[in-house]
Amino acid sequence: MTANESLAPNSQEIAILKEHFPACFNSDGSFDIERFKDYLNDKVNIANEGYELRFLGKNYARLLASVDTTTVIVPDEEHNSKPENANSENVYISGDNLDGLKHLLKSYAKKVKCIYIDPPYNTGSDGFVYNDSYKFTAEELSDKLSISDEQAARILDLTKRGSASHSAWLMFMYPRLLLARDLLADDGAIFISIDDNEQANLKLICDDIFGEENCMGCICRSTGQTTGQDSGGLGSSFDYAFVYGRKPDLDIAGLPLTDHDLKRFDNEDSFGKYAYDQLRKTGSNDRREDRPNMYYAIKDPDGNDVYPTATAGYDSCWRVERKTYDQLVADDYILWKKTTRNGEEVWWPYVKYYLEGRSKRPSPLWTELDGNKKATREVRELFGGVKVFDYVKPVEFIKKIIQISPNMKEGDIILDFFSGSATTAHAVMETEKKYHYIMVQLPAILDETVTSQKVAKEFLENIGRPGTLDQIGMERIIRAAIKIRENNTEITNDLGFRHYSLSEPSGITLDKLEHFSPNDNGMFVSNTVLEEFGITTVLTTWLVRDGYGFTAPVEAVDFAGYTGYYIGKHLYLIKQDLNNEAIVAITEKYETDGTFNPENVVLFGYSFTWTEMESLKTNLARLKDMEKNLRINFDIRY
């Protein structure tokens, strides 16, 4: 029975609770909510009031996030072997992004620093309809979700008839965002573009998934054109990008100062250029009663006491408490200037702000960037004047998002699992720092009834490539990389990428078998994943599954003519014909090579006889009694 059969919508959450609160589970596996409340009672305030987001299919969406993918990862060996791609850390995945996210979680959980997505807006004209390939019956769904047969039938109807309702859009987005949350690093952030049609719903599901306290704001971007005025309303000239952090207390990174900003820093001392602002707090919460610990006397250059009195005459407060003020004085950050207050010339304190290392907090209103029309023209130029996309986000928009992402450093990963026109990949290549990207895009067949898609399909056919959306996205990356190199021959950024496709095996394998019948001679199909896709597919899928990622430097090791694959704590044996000489060679490698210590031996079960596997186990069992004291774990996979 496959593991997916026993999964429930809350399987991930239950696993987390079992790991951290084992005492709250009874012997039969049931969860004791009262014991859990008692455990938390002295640590948190338990609220009995609140609200939650509900929509048709929410539990179904959570179930989809829990079900493991059955796809395999097929490397594009011809593309990946090209010099510009062979050592690239960038990854492009062709496949359903739900499957792609599930594969990524096995290697990149909590490792992605920045996620940007531009999902379907569900406007009615963007082609969004909900469909999925899961083959649940109403009875199965009713049992898994603990709902009525009628509710189960309504959910299945949504999944099969190509609905574009709000519930369908929410059901589509919810599992993808659940998985995306688990990919984010603790100091990472996700940026999600949307327009007016679903922005309210997006805010609700993001609050539900990421936590309302982790919302870092909403970017309002001018698109450069106004739409929707025909309806009699105001129309729209903006779209939005919600920003959520993985955890609270993250700070958006600052932007470089503009020429206008730099004009403020027109003073200079031995520490460098600086601007200054008065020490007294201004604006809201500036009264003594608002900050009583920040109301105190300080000495001016003449030795007189100075209090934070507002020009209106009321007692105000300083910007900092006394201890911090004393440190500012010690560091020479306090500047005294003569000024006129209430008709009298007096000393007044200011705080210096030095230019070095200073940036500015970005505004949520972004009107200075070029709009979508120019972005579309730029992509058209890349394709020699051919318009292959109707709607494209500007590269500068994504670059600015990367720029303000918290705590970004070289080598960090940027993910876009609605890659589309591949603007995110283009932006990453143009950034000054060396980041890596992962793109995921469904290989949707381009629609010849849409002019730009028909043109794109013809373009791809002329260069001998399939007419799918992922292919035109990859071609955009290739052409952008060429242009970047032409403009800067000294660039050392990673401008290549490795390509992988997600494919569903056609045969029934042992790990997928739901029911065994010894009388069913047609139970097994003649081909295996190895026969259908080859060694590199099996190996790549396993490497990602075991946490090594898509670009792991695996080593092919020769064992008396038999090739095994070694990385980290794993030795993979996939091919057939594991003879005695090879088994002896594997054992001797363990015994004589001090750097060869894989604790896990993974075997492709179809390739070996019972005798071969037992012989290998017997030979390697003696390693636990030798100097290395290794106890080998055998993992037989199908």
Q: Which residue ranges define each predicted feature?
A:
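Conserved helicase/translocase motor-coupling segment
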Residues: 545-564
